[in-house]
Amino acid sequence: MGRGRHDTLAPVNHPAGARELAGGSSVSLVANASSAEVVAVKDGEASTPNAETACPEYTPTPLFAFDVQGARVTVWPAQPSGNARNRAGEGGEEDDDGDANRYTRDNHIGGSCGRDGIDCDNRIGDDGNCLNHIVYLHVYDGDGLDVLSECQRIGCPPFTLVAIKPACWNDDLTPWKCPGLFADDVPFAGRAQDQLRLLEEEIIPQVERECGKPNSPRICRTVAGYSLAGLFATWTALNSSAFSRIASASGSLWYPDFAHFATETPLACPIDCAYFSLGSKEAKTPSRLLRNVATGTDEVVAAFRSKGVPTQFESNPGNHFKEPALRMARGITWAISQQATNR
């Protein structure tokens, strides 16, 4: 593991709203002024039938960031809707390139703060529907902008992203000790319980205290992650009442005894939905442990369905390292788009 194999996964970072095409052409993402549709701009020309109505490009700016017990936490505002982008792009003396970002900083959550606690009832509005979403995403490296950019590109509903880079990826996200994947790899320390405590007692209260507004609608929390962070997200649903949704993309569900644990352990709290995905070639590996990932994922998916959780499984082409940000974005998009069932 400590040598760049499988779970030592570095995210694919793309500049916000920009991609490089073959031949050096640039593609930027803009919002269609008549809808929330995202369209491509190649070499300065919008590829949309009504290019003159396109809005200025939206580039997210973090709300704030902080360090806690070796973890780095970066909080991104909810993406503005098409109407918000339009308002930000309208002419006027006060308009400038930062209007879209300022709009989201002023209206980032509209949700509750840490004073309300983090139990099961702190996730839905009076009508039983989620009104504001916060996604807590553990990342191997970076600040989560690559995933946020993909979410915007594929039309994900607005949400506040909390990207958490743990102090030690291999140790902090694993539920119990396990030998390394290969003979010369360092064992996994199994400190997920400590990371969950940090999340519940330090990170969530601080984030929602900074973002929250008194007497505003309640929020839905999703815990999400790729690879070992996907394992952690799945394990969290069985150990914490803080979250109503999980999104595990290419999760390390090969982890020894985890599928059995997921089958035999009741949910810590009823949850609205669970998302799992796996690459079609992920089980094709020299590692004996990693070869169990497909079987383990199937068993975990079946376990969540048997608990009455609306569960989605998606198979993606390729191995563990293909398009991780896009895979994670697809999971987040599905999870926060579902109807609240935990009434």
Where are the model-predicted features located?
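A domain-start/cap signature at the N-terminus of enzymes
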Residues: G2-G89, E93-D97, N101-D106, G110-N132, ...
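C-terminal catalytic histidine-bearing segment of alpha/beta-hydrolase fold enzymes
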Residues: S277-S280, A294-V301, R305-R343
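Active-site nucleophile loop of the alpha/beta-hydrolase fold
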Residues: P166, A247-Y255, K281
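Gly/Ala-rich beta-loop-alpha elbow adjacent to hydrolase catalytic centers
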Residues: A224-A229, A233
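Alpha-helical scaffolding within the catalytic cores
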Residues: S149, L231-F232, P256-C269
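Conserved hydrolase catalytic core segment
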Residues: W235-S244
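Alpha/beta-hydrolase fold nucleophile elbow
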Residues: K213-G225
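Serine-hydrolase catalytic machinery in alpha/beta-hydrolase-like enzymes
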Residues: H133-L198, E202-K213
